[in-house]
Amino acid sequence: MRNRFERQLLELNNELIQMGSMIERAIEMGISALVRQDVEKAKKAIAYDEEIDEQEKTVESLCMKLLLQQQPVAKDLRLISAALKMITDMERIGDHAADISEMTILMSDATYERSAINIDLVESMAKETTDMVIKCVDAFVNKDMELARTVIAQDDVVDDLFADFKQQLIKKINENVKNGEQATDMLSGSSIRSRESTRSRKLV
């Protein structure tokens, strides 16, 4: 009985790793569509969110089987509960990525001046966030508390990037009012990215 339970736990870990990879891809697709104003990629990112939703259901179903068909002890119950919370948070991060893509489509009529916006900061925020998601899953699967602590600290890095981004946008708006709408749009996108980082921190 216990051997079967351990095999199912291994399957759960593999499915969590798969979902983490999907979230990483969703974030990359969303930010790429945003900074390049790629409407087609934005549409694909929105459609991809449905696949993430299906993966969440797969993991949730596996957790329910572990709870109902096996006889988990207290530490196993904590593990399964943590997995359920993790997939909920990851699914919401996927939703945020889709939100950014929807915003990209709404902004598609505007022509953006790269000089008006620090794209590098936006991409850095996305890179940090995806790295946090992958580390969170790795920390959970490998029960690595030290790695989990680095993720918590990494959220501060994203917060600092977002603060820098806001300050630069305010400066750009003051210098050139016509870029104000562009700046506001990108601020909305980077704000969503910051919330993704905060939710990534909650995974650990």
Where in the sequence are the language-model features?
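Cytosolic, long alpha-helical scaffolding segments
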Residues: 1-204
